[in-house]
């Protein structure tokens, strides 16, 4: 048996099936495209579902791929065992109604025994007990001994879901030898690890109906899967996936960084395996466009990075290290994925940002957790504490569960989830709906026919009222609010981030203001109105007229988002993708996937590019075409959006091509100008850019002129050039005054040091000094505490600094008191609780904040009591 490495095996597999007429498909991204049923691609056939069902077509009816996959169901077992991993590649060959069992079986055998030179005498096969066709091919055509073909039941060798395509499967197993099971009659299907399944051939030949019947399908399919890491284990004679050469190279890097040797200590081995696995997974996740966040696949990535960070800490790695392991990962995968090297800087930047962010709170969070665990004798760790670790220190609940589990405790997840939900409710705030006089829960328009929409071509039209929803059935009167449904409309219904149109609906007897337009899933347009004159009844003819100025402003903003999107990709990086948008007549809001703030310089460059494209007057071309055709010209859509077979493509020259159903300008010069007004964070891994165009920019500039005039007047500057000089003069003057004030304050505080020490409470030889200050800056506050501490041999300093709305606390502990078990973090937490706050820190210094400054005396007394309890006084 030849010792082929993982990258060699992948190439040989794809070449083998490519030579047999298969279309060689590049691995799909880990983010599923147009499939909301999956969080991440977890199997070789997962991205090919629509080709198996016939919804989509490839150039050939047979294909082969090496698909990268992520499975996180057993993430807690990774490292603890040598079998589990989150990242793997799945080799597969597929037939979409082309060849069937004979070819699938004979090619699989030929590839293993001839191409990879796996000895025939270590290979076994299992088949479904009723699949005589497959059994006969294995025995009579391949020539494998009947003793090594095992018939198994549905649980092992029949692939099916509740209903839909299904069929028997045949698995190829490797006999790993008597050391795994000494029994002479051992065979596949037995418990134990002697027989390793390496290749599964699924013969999809039935359709399972809702009533449980199996119907043969006219054109059966083939779906095979062979784990690349598993077959590499076999060829390299490795015991597990962490022993194959490629992963061993990554482990070697971890050994060099940590100074810890693999296979010398079980606890260290667990950490090394976790890092090796998780860094492989995070490298490919980031490459495929995932950004760390607190939701869905972003949370998976965040959890992987943070688990790797924590296990690096357990190995004694105190500095950032993930970048070096990623570099090792990119190097070993370079021949199969050269694009990783090209994208290396972005991958590292995202991982480094998340690692740094977590390291900032990891030590403090671990200390807090340790204190929390010491404070309870219960086997259940409270949900309140778990929530505090999550909310204050960024500990994902899974990490808390893992850490708590290591000391044989469990987390009260019910209470944790309750607190999380309460926080979400607070964030949502009060959402009182306007009292429109009828139920706001009803789904309007569900029973009505689709509304004909002609708003792309005109703003005014004649229409007929087919339904009214309001206080009275079938009619609306002056002063009432309601919803009007028409047989045709020119009003755009809210969708794709664009707000609905405003305007008027009227006839000789009636007039109403349309303040919003929405569209149901069945394309029924709902016109939200306030009646200003007369009355309206179902069946009435009306004139409809969209507010032209508002629509034009919306068009400018929407077209600008397309230019903005591409400019951000050009300047910030191609990983930038749309995460949401909002477009109305006043402004545009554009959310993007990005891991850090977009710099001022980058924003200026983006703004310049967009305005250059506006100045060029690029024609905006809009076409309808098939989804496949749009993809062939490079049209960009949102991964998770579900598109119809015919899509609307908005093209701005060769600069921007996007799928979009919104309203747009005729040429980019219609936008007039774009001004970015803010950039901020809305969630982990998501940045928000707000901008204005057209008339709004003019208003913005007029307001800026007014502000500059006010500043000139306040500074007594004769012109704009003099403003800067005046500010610099005033700043220097303020600095000097602040220094004088600080000198006076410090002198005054220094005179109080001795009196604070003289008033100290002595507890078993330890002096406890407490004092309340007011309105002090942070530096002076801490300096005062350090001055007192420096004059104590064995002591604790607890200080409060309050004003009307809040209070700050610090606790300082001398080395001799720390040795007695008195820790600043413990003290300051108890003190802050009295005033409704929290905090923490090191053993010798800690700080906290609270809102209730009325209980400072009580809080300082609590500090003294806490020290007494620590000293058993």
Swiss-Prot record:
Gene: alaS
Protein task: Catalyzes the attachment of alanine to tRNA(Ala) in a two-step reaction: alanine is first activated by ATP to form Ala-AMP and then transferred to the acceptor end of tRNA(Ala). Also edits incorrectly charged Ser-tRNA(Ala) and Gly-tRNA(Ala) via its editing domain.
Region (Disordered): 424-443
InterPro entries: aa-tRNA-synth_II/BPL/LPL (IPR045864), Ala-tRNA-lgiase_IIc (IPR002318), Ala-tRNA-ligase_IIc_anticod-bd (IPR018162), Ala-tRNA-synth_IIc_core (IPR018165), Ala-tRNA-synth_IIc_N (IPR018164), Ala-tRNA_ligase (IPR050058), Ala_tRNA_ligase_euk/bac (IPR023033), DHHA1_dom (IPR003156)
PROSITE patterns (alphabetical): AA_TRNA_LIGASE_II_ALA
Domain notes: Consists of three domains; the N-terminal catalytic domain, the editing domain and the C-terminal C-Ala domain. The editing domain removes incorrectly charged amino acids, while the C-Ala domain, along with tRNA(Ala), serves as a bridge to cooperatively bring together the editing and aminoacylation centers thus stimulating deacylation of misacylated tRNAs.
GO MF annotations, alphabetized: alanine-tRNA ligase activity; aminoacyl-tRNA deacylase activity; ATP binding; catalytic activity, acting on a protein; transferase activity; tRNA binding; zinc ion binding
Family under the similarity heading: Belongs to the class-II aminoacyl-tRNA synthetase family.
CDD domains per the UniProt record, alphabetical: AlaRS_core
Main enzyme class: ligase
Localisation per UniProt entry: Cytoplasm
Annotated binding of Zn(2+), by residue: 558, 562, 660, 664
Database matches in SUPFAM superfamilies: Class II aaRS and biotin synthetases, Putative anticodon-binding domain of alanyl-tRNA synthetase (AlaRS), ThrRS/AlaRS common domain, Translation proteins
PANTHER family for this protein: ALANINE--TRNA LIGASE, CYTOPLASMIC, ALANYL-TRNA SYNTHETASE
Protein name in UniProt: Alanine--tRNA ligase
Cofactors: Zn(2+)
Keywords for the protein's UniProt record, in alphabetical order: Aminoacyl-tRNA synthetase, ATP-binding, Cytoplasm, Ligase, Metal-binding, Nucleotide-binding, Protein biosynthesis, RNA-binding, tRNA-binding, Zinc
EC number(s) reported in the record: 6.1.1.7
Entry note: cofactor: Binds 1 zinc ion per subunit.
């Amino acid at each position: 048996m030849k010792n082929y490495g993982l990258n060699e095996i992948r190439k040989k597999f794809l070449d083998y099936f490519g030579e047999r007429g298969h279309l060689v498909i590049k691995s799909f991204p880990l983010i599923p495209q147009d499939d909301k049923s999956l969080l991440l691609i977890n199997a070789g056939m997962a991205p090919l579902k629509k080709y198996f069902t016939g919804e989509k077509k490839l150039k050939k009816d047979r294909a082969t791929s090496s698909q990268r996959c992520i499975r996180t169901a057993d993430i807690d077992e990774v490292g603890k065992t040598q079998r589990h991993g989150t990242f793997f590649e799945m080799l597969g060959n597929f037939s979409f109604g082309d060849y069937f069992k004979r070819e699938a079986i004979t090619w699989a055998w030929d590839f293993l025994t001839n191409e990879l030179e796996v000895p025939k005498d270590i290979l076994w096969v299992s088949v479904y007990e009723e699949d005589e066709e497959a059994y006969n091919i294995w025995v009579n055509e391949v020539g494998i001994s009947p003793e090594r073909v095992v018939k198994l039941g549905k649980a092992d060798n029949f692939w099916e879901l509740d209903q839909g395509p299904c069929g028997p499967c045949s698995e190829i197993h490797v006999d790993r030898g008597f050391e795994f099971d000494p029994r002479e009659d051992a065979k596949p299907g037995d418990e134990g690890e002697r027989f390793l399944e390496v290749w599964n051939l699924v013969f999809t030949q039935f359709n399972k109906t809702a009533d449980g019947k199996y119907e043969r399908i006219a054109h059966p399919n083939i779906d095979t899967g062979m784990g690349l890491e598993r077959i590499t284990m076999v060829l390299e004679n490795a015991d597990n996936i962490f022993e194959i050469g490629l992963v061993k190279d990554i482990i070697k890097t971890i050994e060099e960084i940590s100074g810890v040797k693999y296979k010398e200590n079980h606890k260290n081995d667990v950490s090394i395996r976790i890092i090796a696995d998780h860094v492989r997974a995070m490298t490919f996740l980031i490459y495929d466009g995932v950004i760390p966040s607190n939701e869905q696949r972003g949370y998976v990535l965040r959890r992987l990075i943070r688990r790797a960070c924590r296990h690096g800490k357990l190995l004694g790695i105190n500095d950032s290290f993930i970048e070096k392991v990623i570099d090792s990962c990119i190097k070993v995968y370079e021949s199969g994925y050269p694009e990783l090297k090209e994208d290396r800087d972005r991958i590292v930047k995202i991982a480094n940002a998340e690692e740094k962010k977590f390291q900032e709170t990891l030590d403090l969070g671990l200390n807090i957790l340790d204190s929390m665990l010491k404070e309870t004798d219960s086997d259940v760790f409270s949900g309140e504490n778990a929530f505090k670790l999550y909310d204050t220190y960024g500990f994902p609940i899974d990490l808390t569960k893992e850490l708590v589990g290591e000391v044989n405790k469990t987390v009260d997840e019910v209470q944790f989830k309750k607190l999380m939900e309460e926080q979400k409710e607070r964030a949502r705030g009060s959402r009182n709906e306007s009292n429109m006089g009828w139920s706001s829960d009803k789904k309007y328009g569900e029973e009505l026919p689709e509304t004909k929409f002609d708003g792309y071509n005109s703003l005014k039209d004649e229409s007929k009222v087919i339904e009214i929803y309001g206080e009275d059935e079938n009619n609306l009167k002056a002063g009432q609010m309601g919803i009007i449904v028409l047989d045709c409309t020119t009003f755009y219904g809210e969708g794709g981030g664009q707000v609905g149109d405003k305007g008027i609906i009227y006839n000789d007897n009636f007039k109403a203001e349309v303040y919003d337009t929405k569209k149901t899933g069945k394309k029924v347009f709902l016109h939200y109105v306030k009646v200003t004159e007369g009355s309206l009844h179902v069946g009435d003819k009306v004139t409809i007229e969209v507010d032209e100025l508002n629509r034009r402003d919306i068009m400018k903003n929407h077209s600008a988002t397309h230019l903005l999107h591409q400019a951000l990709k050009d300047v910030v990086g191609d990983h930038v993708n749309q995460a949401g948008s909002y477009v109305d007549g006043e402004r545009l809001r554009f959310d993007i996937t990005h891991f850090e703030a977009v710099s001022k310089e980058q924003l200026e460059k983006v703004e310049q590019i967009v305005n250059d494209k506006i100045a060029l007057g690029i024609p905006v071309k809009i076409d309808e075409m098939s989804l496949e055709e749009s993809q062939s010209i490079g049209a960009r859509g949102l991964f998770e959006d579900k598109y119809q077979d015919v899509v609307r493509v908005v093209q701005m020259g060769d600069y921007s091509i996007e799928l979009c159903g919104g309203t747009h300008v005729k040429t980019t010069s219609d936008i007039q100008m774009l001004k970015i007004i803010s950039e901020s964070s809305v969630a982990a891994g998501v940045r928000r850019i707000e901008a204005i165009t057209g008339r709004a920019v003019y208003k913005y500039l007029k307001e800026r002129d007014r502000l500059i005039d006010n500043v000139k007047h306040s500074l007594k500057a004769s012109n704009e050039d003099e403003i800067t000089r005046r500010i610099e003069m005033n700043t220097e003057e303020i600095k000097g005054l602040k220094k004088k004030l600080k000198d006076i304050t410090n002198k005054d505080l220094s005179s109080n040091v001795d009196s604070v020490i003289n008033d100290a409470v002595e507890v078993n030889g330890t002096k406890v000094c407490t004092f309340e200050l007011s309105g002090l800056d942070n530096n002076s506050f801490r300096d005062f505490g350090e001055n007192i501490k420096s004059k104590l041999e064995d002591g604790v300093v607890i200080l409060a600094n309050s004003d009307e709305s809040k209070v700050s606390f610090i606790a300082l502990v001398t080395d001799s008191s720390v040795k007695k078990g008195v820790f600043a973090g413990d003290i300051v937490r108890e003190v802050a609780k009295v005033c409704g706050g929290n905090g923490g820190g090191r053993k010798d210094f800690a700080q906290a904040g609270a809102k209730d400054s009325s209980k400072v005396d009580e809080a300082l007394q609590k500090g003294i009591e806490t020290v007494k309890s620590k000293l058993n006084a």
